[in-house]
Curated annotation (Swiss-Prot):
Keywords: Cell cycle, Cell division, Chaperone, Cytoplasm, Isomerase, Rotamase. Involved in protein export. Acts as a chaperone by maintaining the newly synthesized protein in an open conformation. Functions as a peptidyl-prolyl cis-trans isomerase. It comes from Akkermansia muciniphila (strain ATCC BAA-835 / DSM 22959 / JCM 33894 / BCRC 81048 / CCUG 64013 / CIP 107961 / Muc). This is Trigger factor. Its EC number is 5.2.1.8. Consists of 3 domains; the N-terminus binds the ribosome, the middle domain has PPIase activity, while the C-terminus has intrinsic chaperone activity on its own. Belongs to the FKBP-type PPIase family. Tig subfamily.
Amino acid sequence: MEINVDIQPDCTATLKASIPAETTAARRASIVDSYAAKAKLPGFRPGKTPKSIIEKRFKKEMEEELLDTLFETACSTALEENPKLKVLSFGKPEQSLDDQGNYTATSTMTVVPEFELPEYKGIEVKVPSSEVTEADVEEALNSLAEQIAEFTPVDRAAQKDDVAIIDFKTTLDGKPVAEAVGKPVGFLEGRDGQWMKVEDDQFLPGFASALEGLNAGDSKDITVTIPDTFPITELRGKELVFHATVKEVREKQLPAMDDAFAEKVLPGKNLEELKTALKENLAQRKAMQIDEAKADQITEKLADMLDFNLPEAVVEREVYGILQQKMQQAMYSGNAPADMDKFVEEAREEAKQEAKRNLKVFFMLQEVAQVEKIAVTEMELYNEVARQARQQKKNLKSYIRELQREGRVHGIRMSLLTAKVLDFLTKEAKVTVDEQ
């Protein structure tokens, strides 16, 4: 067997292989034996069908299996003979068997880019203070108070932070909005007894603030220009008129900061115990935020340290994934682009730059893992899969089979490895606390 690997500067390598006829004949004979042992053909007992009939009946299938087997052998031999070669994927081969049975194949491989790791220990990062202040606890208490505030009826004009209970109907160009656009528009058509907080941007820009100063029984026509990001494309940029009548004004009543308040928020606890629990929770959140800040700064600095060629096919796959994610985010946020093709075209360049940075960091982290002998154990992988199964309320064995069937186990392993390498780098980083 002859194997030749020619590495190119664009993260590809050409594999050329030739396997002599005597080797291919032995492989062919092994495949024929395998088919003969399993074949069930009319008129013959299992395993007793003449090989000449087997070769004729399954000629196409055995030829394909032989070529696949020979190519796999060529690939594994290439990796054995070139231990420093890091192959991401083998391209579909151009392969053939000549009349004498000699096998030849040529394949373009995508390989990991070659680069020298920069100094990755002692990366300087700046993080916020981990101290939880009394002001932090007070802010958390106020947020909880807002969540359980009550709204009581008042006999006065609506003010900011009040709630106005309104009836409204909506028109476009003098017609009911659904009639004007020719389809239902849901909530925008109108509502009776709608609670509306009197502040900007809770519903549509300028709508809620226009209720300020109105008393129960007052009516007002409120004109709003629909934003260009609105999910109903027919309404973007249009002026809608909301014919609103205030039925009732309610004032926000915040609870007193006492033990009764604490009991509502955290049953069985008094105010001091609630403050202690909040302080512990805030400390945990700050610790997580600091770890995230360290990891973000380290990856950004790693990406800026080196510039090297990346496999174009891998970049394109990453770009595709990023664009898919951006489209899903736009749709889930209610800002679906009117022209999806134009959206993709405009987002592609930004996605490509993001993809290149992601991949540079990925390959560098993989190299750090190899140098520092960082690996993911089978128990760590199992624990993560079990955690995901619990989170998704799935049977563990069924979930494992699902991951294996969909080829997602490797991705989970890589995510865990990336996290372990980043954890290693954060421990090795030079950390400065920003006291501001």
